[in-house]
Amino acid sequence: MSGDCIASLKMVESQPLNSKEVEYVEKLLDPFDPVDTVERFTHNPNDPISVPIDPALIWSRKAIMRLIGLVVVLIINFPKVRDKINLNPYLVWVITTLILMGVFY
């Protein structure tokens, strides 16, 4: 396609329907009732449909601290900020390392 002239390409205005595919999709969708609303279920032991909420999806204090630590490290290492604070590059590296080690370990 890299050497083709785009002006010579033509789009197809309409494509004939494949009746086999339509029939197949109708057969697949036939046993299901139409869904009008989607509800969010919480874990209820008496309800057979309920789904327990995964605790890994809930933001923990540890995840928030990691996010804050990463943002601080990115801000410190941003070139304009690094020039404004006038610190030795080694000292910036030490501060970054301490923040990352403190947050992740």
Swiss-Prot record:
GO cellular component, alphabetical, reads: membrane
Q: Where primarily located?
A: membrane
What membrane topology does the UniProt entry give? Answer: Multi-pass membrane protein
Q: Which UniProt keywords apply?
A: Membrane, Transmembrane, Transmembrane helix
Q: Where in the cell is it found?
A: Membrane
Where does the chain cross the membrane? 56-76, 85-105
Q: Does the keyword Transmembrane apply?
A: yes
Its recorded name reads: Uncharacterized protein 126R
Species in which this protein is naturally found: Invertebrate iridescent virus 3
